[in-house]
Amino acid sequence: MQEGLNFVIDGGKKLSGTVATSRSKNGAVALLAASLLNRGKTILQNVPKIEEVNRLIEVLRSIGVRVEWKDHDLVIVPPDKIDIESIDKVAATKTRSILMFIGSLIHSLQEFDLPQSGGCTLGLRSIRPHLLALENFGIKIEALSDNYHIHSTKLVPAEVILYESSDTATINALLSAACIPGVSVIKYASANYQVQETCGFLRTLGVGIDGIGGTTLTIHGIAEINKDISYSIAEDPTDAMFFIAAAIVTGSAVTIAAAPIEFLEVELLLLEKMGLQFTLDNPRLSENDITKLVDIHLESSDLTAFPEKIHARPYPGLNIDNLPFFAVIATVANGTTLIHDWVYEKRAIYYTELDRLGATTILHDPHRISIEGPAHLKAAEVICPPALRPATIILVGMLAAKGRSTLRNVYSINRGYEDIVARLQKLGASIETSTN
C-alpha cells in the first residue's frame, strides 16, 4: 500500500520526447478475474505493475491461486480447490474489480461470499446491472451489509439484455456464459476496450464468441477449460489520454506511441475542433491482434472552448474515464467549457479542486461544471482526491502550474498508472516522490 506517498512537482516546464502507452489497467483486472476459468496455466504478458493489479493478486493468492511475476508477465496457476473462506478481505474491499470474480467463481463454487468492494469513491455505484444480468444464467446475488452472497443451483445458457451498458456487468456476463455449455447471447453489451480484451482472452481459451466490437455478443460456452496459454494485454486509452492532456496543458510537443486509436477518436475529434494540432502515423495491431495502434504526434496549440457541452457516452462515444481530462484541458482553452458528467453522482465536484491551482469553475450541480479559460495556474498543496481520474487531472494541472506543488497521498493515482513519475521525468517534467 502507498497511502503516505506524495508527488512534489516544480511546474510550468515544457515537456518533450516520446512516451509509450502503458498497458490497460481495466483490461488487466478483467483478465485476472477471467483467469479463474482456466484449470491450466495462464501467462498474462505485459501486465501493468499498478496498485489495482497488486490488490487482485493478493486476493488470488489468498484463495489458493499461485501467482508469480516474471518481469512484466504474470504466471497464474489455479489450485485444486478454491479456498474462498481465506479471501483477503482488506485487499478485496480496495477494488471494485472484485465484482468480476462472480462470473468466474460461480463455475467452481455453488455458493460463496465476496466482500463489499470499494475502488473509486464516486457515489452510489449499483450492482443491479450485475444482478439482473447474471440471474438469467441462474446466478443469484444478494447485497448484504458488508458482503455479497452469491449462489446458484443450476447454470443454464441464456439470452441476457443489459439495461445499462456496463463494462463490468458485460464482463461478468461473458465469464458466466463462457463455461456454460450451449449458446448464450448478451444484448446491449458494452463494446469498450476491456470488454474486447476479455473476448480476445476467452477466444484464446477456446470459447467461441461472435460480435466482438458490437453490442450483441454470442457466446458458445464450453463445459471446462484446461489449457496452458499466453495472452498479451493491450494498451490503455486512458493512459494515452493522460499524456495528451499533460502535453496540451503544458503547451508541449509530445509523441504518444502505441495509442489505441479506436478508443480515442472522439476525444481527438473534439480536441481538433478546439484547435489541437496533431498527426497520426505508424498504424499497427497490438499483440492481441484486436487493438489498433497508432503514434500520436502532438504540437503545442492554442485551444478554444468547445461550443457544446462535453459529455461521455458508452463506446463508441467519448470514454467515461477520459471525460475528466477535459476539465483540466478547459483551464487552458479560451472561453467557457461546460462539462456534463452524468454517470457519477459526485465526480464533477472533484473537478472544483482545480480552483486550488487557480482555475475558475462554477459547479451547477453534482453533474455539471463550467470552467473558464485560459487560467494562469499556480502552485498549491492538494490532498489527492480518492477517485483515480479526478486525482490525475490535479497532477496534470500541477505540471503546468508555475512553482512547487505537492500532491499528497497519491495511492489513487498509483492504482491505475504505472511508473508515472519516471515516465514524466523522461519527458522533462520536474517531479519527485516523497513520503509523509
Predicted regions and their residues:
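Short, structured segments at the rim of ligand-binding sites
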Residues: 1-436
